[in-house]
Amino acid sequence: MAGRATIPARNSALIAMIADEDTVVGFLMAGVGNVDIRRKTNYLIVDSKTTVRQIEDAFKEFSARDDIAIILLSQYIANMIRFLVDSYNKPVPAILEIPSKDHPYDPAHDSVLSRVKYLFSAESVSQR
């Protein structure tokens, strides 16, 4: 299949998280957390003191790491850096927006879902 992006195969990859404390702790208790040899974690806990700049930096760092396959973002945090999330176009790491305890999930704001809807609507139109 010419023109398709290849996804490198590896034995293991990490899930990164940018979310509120309760969400991150839940995933850490499930065994998703990691601290590498340079003491870098695969998560950022966002609270009222976290700046948008820190969130942007964490997103850029996680999306550039080759050991991360998925980045989980609480949707309300993704809305803070929507321009970065919407402009991200690589297949790996995949960006998934998730709900949080205090902020419900709204499919209208999910950039991945809107891209899929556009793809299927464009595909269905081109097949007619």
UniProtKB/Swiss-Prot annotation:
Subcellular location: Vacuole membrane
One Pfam family named in its UniProt record: ATP-synt_F
S-S bridge residues: none
Membrane topology: Peripheral membrane protein
Keyword Transit peptide attached: no
Keyword Transferase: no
An annotated Gene Ontology molecular function: proton-transporting ATPase activity, rotational mechanism
Gene3D superfamilies noted in UniProt: ATPase, V1 complex, subunit F
InterPro entries: ATPase_V1-cplx_f_g_su, ATPase_V1-cplx_fsu_euk, ATPase_V1_fsu_sf
A GO CC annotation given for this chain: vacuolar membrane
UniProt entry keywords in alphabetical sequence: Hydrogen ion transport, Ion transport, Membrane, Transport, Vacuole
Family membership: Belongs to the V-ATPase F subunit family.
NCBIfam families xrefs: V_ATP_synt_F (TIGR01101)
Function: Subunit of the peripheral V1 complex of vacuolar ATPase essential for assembly or catalytic function. V-ATPase is responsible for acidifying a variety of intracellular compartments in eukaryotic cells.
Subunit relationships: V-ATPase is a heteromultimeric enzyme composed of a peripheral catalytic V1 complex (components A to H) attached to an integral membrane V0 proton pore complex (components: a, c, c'', d and e).
Protein name per Swiss-Prot or TrEMBL: V-type proton ATPase subunit F
UniProt gene name: VHA-F
